[in-house]
Regions:
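Short sequence/structural elements of tandem HEAT/ARM alpha-solenoid repeats
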Residues: 26-32, 69-75, 102-110, 114, ...
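Buried hydrophobic core positions in alpha-solenoid tandem helical repeats
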Residues: 1, 36-38, 99, 108-116, ...
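Register-specific detector for alpha-helical tandem repeat solenoids, activating on a conserved position
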Residues: 110-113, 132, 142, 154, ...
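Alpha-helical solenoid repeats of the armadillo/HEAT superfamily
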Residues: 1-19, 26-29, 45-72, 118-136, ...
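Alpha-helical solenoid scaffolds in large eukaryotic transport, assembly, and signaling factors
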Residues: 21-26, 33, 38, 100, ...
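Acidic, serine/threonine- and proline-enriched intrinsically disordered linkers and terminal tails
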Residues: 54-111
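Acidic, Ser/Thr- and Gly/Pro-rich intrinsically disordered linkers and low-complexity segments
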Residues: 1-2, 45, 89-93, 112-116
Length: 198
């Protein structure tokens, strides 16, 4: 029991720390730590560590929504001499893409698949965001399908938050463009009703 709690706390602590781009890069240098998180997700398959692991992955892949700052607010902040947060150079697209690519190769989809049946719609949305980010890369879509990601995305596209459904549908569309449907969606016939729901 204590060991399980310790793992959960470690995952939640790392999820908070990965808001910092320097920590994201340091974590990505430690393949063992990432693989331990994947194994934790596959072993636990419960809500205890789901939030920490999935939030960490959202932070590392920058799959969260970025708030747009209106130009008027920017000018007002400058006038008031208020600090305006700048995006960290390690959160540039090249660095983020490299992190997503590495996570995809290391099998992060299997960790997300372990959690997709979670009752929390917020966790489901976060899973859809990360899977969609991995599906951005044509070469990784095969890994996503092999590890059960297309099945998870299909389920997430039909239930959960609107944003979660949208991300899941986009991930499915990306898979559908490049993968053989008989392989990506075995045994599933997509009905017109399902397509309209998505």
């Amino acid at each position: 029991m204590f060991r399980r709690d310790l793992r959960r706390w470690a995952a939640e602590g790392l999820s908070y720390l990965t808001l910092d781009a320097d920590v994201k890069e340091k974590l990505m240098e430690d393949e063992g730590a990432i693989k331990a998180l994947i194994e934790l997700a596959k072993a636990e398959k419960n809500e205890d560590c789901a939030y920490g692991v999935v939030t960490l992955l959202v932070n590392v892949t920058n799959s969260f929504e970025k708030q747009e700052i209106m130009p008027e607010m920017l000018e007002l902040a400058k006038f008031a001499k208020h600090h305006i947060p700048q995006e960290h150079e390690l959160d540039d697209e090249d660095f983020v893409d490299k992190r997503i690519w590495t996570l995809g190769e290391w099998g992060i989809t299997s960790a997300l698949v372990a959690f997709y049946k979670n009752d929390s719609q917020n966790i489901q949305e976060l899973i859809a965001r990360v899977l969609n980010a991995v599906c951005k890369f044509t070469e990784l879509r095969g890994f996503v399908v092999q590890q059960g990601g297309s099945k998870a995305l299909a389920a997430l596209a039909l239930e959960g938050t609107e944003k979660g459904k949208r991300h899941a549908a986009q991930g499915l569309a990306r898979i559908g463009i490049t993968q053989d449907p008989a392989i990506a969606f075995p045994g599933n016939r997509v009905s017109k009703k399902t397509l309209l729901e998505i």
